[in-house]
Design a protein with these regions (language model features):
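Histidine-dependent nucleotide/RNA phosphoesterase domain, centered on the 2H-phosphoesterase fold
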Residues: 1-183
């Protein structure tokens, strides 16, 4: 089963993100746009794991969640990871309690490594992917100027989840396997 650890957002936040995604779509020649219901903050991509491994992962996440307080973040920037001929991933980024988020991320990394999962080598850049393989009609800086984050209120990360990713009817669907409340 293909999985990751993440934090989900409520419908209001997802709808606001979709509003920004709409601006991006209007100013793009091509791209793959994320389904609104799938907007999330990835804390750790696990990849393919065996069903029985979810029990140990769940126990670890429960212990981690009990030690970490809720995290307040602001969605207030747009950026991208570059691809060869296009933007590989267009994302929304955060400010706010990034130090607390970093501590949560590091503990998840260490605990998953202890369970035999691969450690991430790249620096963690917390973000929400809204599009992939994107080719814009306008320069990125012009797109950035069109995006307004004033309607976003502070997002509170209250829980973390082990999330299953599967393809259903040609569309990727994310389903929480287990969810743990932060203290």
């Amino acid at each position: 089963m293909r999985t990751f650890i993440g934090a989900e957002f409520n419908r209001d936040i997802k709808d606001r993100i979709a509003g920004i995604q709409h601006i991006v779509r209007e100013n793009s020649e091509k791209g793959r746009f994320k389904y609104v219901g799938n907007f999330h903050l990835t804390l750790k991509f696990l990849g393919e794991i065996q069903q029985d491994k979810t029990v140990d992962i769940g126990k670890s996440l429960k212990g981690i969640a009990e030690k970490h307080q809720k995290i307040r973040l602001n969605i207030d920037k747009i950026g991208y990871f570059d691809g060869r001929d296009s933007i590989h991933a267009l994302w929304l980024g955060f400010s706010g309690e990034l130090d607390k988020l970093g501590r949560l991320y590091n503990e998840i990394e260490e605990e998953m490594y202890r369970l035999g999962l691969k450690k991430e080598i790249k620096k963690y850049t917390p973000h929400i992917t809204i599009a992939q393989d994107l080719r814009l009609k306008i320069p990125f800086e012009a797109l950035r100027e069109k995006v307004d984050f004033r309607d976003f209120r502070t997002v509170e990360i209250k829980e973390i989840s082990l999330i299953k990713s599967e393809e259903v009817g040609g569309k990727r669907i994310y389903t929480p396997v287990s969810t743990f409340e932060l203290k």
